[in-house]
Design a protein with these regions (language model features):
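Active-site neighborhoods of divalent-metal-dependent phosphate/nucleic-acid chemistry enzymes
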Residues: 12, 18, 59-122
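Non-catalytic, well-ordered alpha-helical scaffold segments
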Residues: 33, 37, 87-90
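Short, well-structured N-terminal submotif of metal-dependent ribonuclease cores
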Residues: 1-34, 40-52
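Ligand-binding grooves and catalytic loops that recognize ribose/phosphate and carbohydrate rings
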Residues: 47-57, 67-68
Length: 122
């Protein structure tokens, strides 16, 4: 299963991505509340329709704030340039069995690669 980051979704909304379309058709996509939240704050066409459709996609493991704090410490994520929302998404991908994170955010991708949860389907 592929946890698709907001950066990939936003690009897909603007210009459809064949790889993402195939994943969606196969049911191989996961989302996260924070990813949907980031997209909700964007100015995109058909915003409401997009948000309704995103909420239909299965979600990755929910991770508590305490688990994220522990994750940050255990994997020394401080100083990597990722933000707290990114740390939540990364921890969720890490803790969801078989999940991989697809992002176009360079710092998040590099960190996901170090944790062996990255995928790049561009």
């Amino acid at each position: 299963m592929i946890l698709v980051d907001a950066s990939v979704w936003i690009d897909h909304i603007r210009s459809p991505n064949d790889a993402l379309e195939r994943l969606l058709e196969r049911g191989d996509v996961l989302t996260h509340a924070f990813i949907i939240g980031e997209i909700a704050l964007c100015h995109i066409r058909r915003r409401r329709d997009v948000l309704v459709e995103l909420r239909k996609i299965p979600t990755s493991e929910a991770v508590s704030d305490e688990e994220v704090f522990e994750f940050i410490e255990r994997y020394r994520l401080f100083g990597t340039g990722i933000g707290y929302v990114d740390a939540h998404i990364l921890a969720s991908a890490f803790m969801t069995p078989g999940a991989r994170l697809w992002t176009r955010d360079k710092r998040l991708r590099v960190t996901a690669e170090k944790l062996n949860v990255a995928t790049n389907l561009n």
